[in-house]
Swiss-Prot record:
Recorded family membership: Belongs to the LDH/MDH superfamily. MDH type 1 family.
UniProt keyword list: NAD, Oxidoreductase, Tricarboxylic acid cycle
Upper taxonomic lineage: Bacteria, Pseudomonadati, Pseudomonadota, Gammaproteobacteria, Alteromonadales
Organism: Shewanella oneidensis (strain ATCC 700550 / JCM 31522 / CIP 106686 / LMG 19005 / NCIMB 14063 / MR-1)
CDD domains: MDH_glyoxysomal_mitochondrial
Name of the molecule in the record: Malate dehydrogenase
């Protein structure tokens, strides 16, 4: 099993690489790529951790050496949010970065499962799909927008609010990965009920959690450590699916034939081909149905931005 992290010298990438070095199955290979010259050194640093995961780092303009033979590619390259920016402000820089990296993935490891972390995810996933279509290698079951951070935040905030063991909290988060497009299905959480006020405030907190971190770091960064953990959870689920483990389910932003939009975050069953099955997200409350329907114009606009960028 080989996993490649593109953008491995950044805040998310380093946290993700550390977690993968400690969690990947014995005998796995982990390859780190970043444009930054420090990247081989990050790999040397991590190589001192005593786990049976072979690690190599590559720097420079071309990610190809890191991608050869990759089964899973996780892309966190790009610029991070600063105070006053929203995820769409990142588009101008990150769109080109994702396009260039995916062009290399399409040539070097077209069958790899690709998880896009780089924001704005609603748009960068559409860019990746268009690039792969142009290259003639697009497989909608192998491309994912990583929305796991919305899920782990939901789990954490629900457990805090209701005094639950966070390990017992399970929730689907649907839609997209920014602002109003993030929709936690609180009505489905088992064993708890929320007042209308709690639903409204919790939904808003989950949607704005990224901004909460950006502001708390006072210009010193964005949500890198929690995103590293979220990306590791999703990456490990991809690996477990590839290894044939049964019933591996995660929410992800995918081209899953949704009635709502071309790309939509919802639960998917993972396996040897990536997405084995897109799962229904279940019954929703009136509040959730309204929130879902009113986000769709925003989501579709984000997707169109990505499609138009490549065309």
């Amino acid at each position: 099993m080989k996993v490649a992290v593109l953008g491995a010298a950044g805040g998310i990438g380093q946290a993700l690489a550390l977690l993968l070095k400690t969690q990947l199955p014995a005998g796995s290979k982990l390859s780190l790529y970043d444009i930054a010259p420090v990247t081989p050194g990050v790999a040397v640093d991590l190589s001192h951790i005593p786990t049976a995961v072979e690690i190599k780092g590559f720097a420079g303009e071309d990610p190809t050496p890191a991608l050869v033979g990759a089964d899973v590619v996780l892309i966190s390259a790009g610029v991070a949010r600063k105070p006053g920016m929203d995820r769409s402000d990142l588009f101008n820089i990150n769109a080109g970065i994702v396009r260039n990296l995916i062009e290399k993935v399409a040539v070097t490891c077209p069958k790899a499962l690709v998880g896009i972390i780089t924001n704005p995810v609603n748009t960068t996933v559409a860019i990746a799909a268009e690039v792969m279509k142009k290259a003639g290698v697009y497989d909608k079951n192998r491309l994912f927008g990583v929305t796991t951070l919305d899920v782990i935040r939901s789990e954490t905030f629900i457990a805090e609010l209701k005094g639950l063991n966070v390990a017992d909290v399970k929730i689907n988060v649907i839609g997209g990965h920014s602002g109003v497009t993030i929709l936690p299905l609180l009505s489905q959480v088992e064993g708890v009920t929320f007042s209308d006020e709690e639903v409204a405030s919790l939904t808003k907190r989950i949607q704005n959690a990224g901004t909460e971190v950006v502001e708390a770091k006072a210009g010193g960064g964005s949500a890198t450590l929690s995103m590293g953990q979220a990306a590791c959870r999703f990456g490990m689920s991809l690996v477990r699916g590839l290894q044939g483990e049964a019933n591996v389910v995660e929410c992800a932003y995918v081209d899953g034939g949704s009635e709502h939009a071309e790309f939509f975050a919802q639960p998917v069953l993972l396996g040897k081909n990536g997405i084995e099955k897109v799962l229904p997200y279940g019954e929703v409350s009136a509040f959730e149905a309204n929130a879902r329907d009113s986000m769709l114009d925003t989501l579709k606009g984000d997707i169109k931005l990505g499609v138009d960028f490549v065309k």
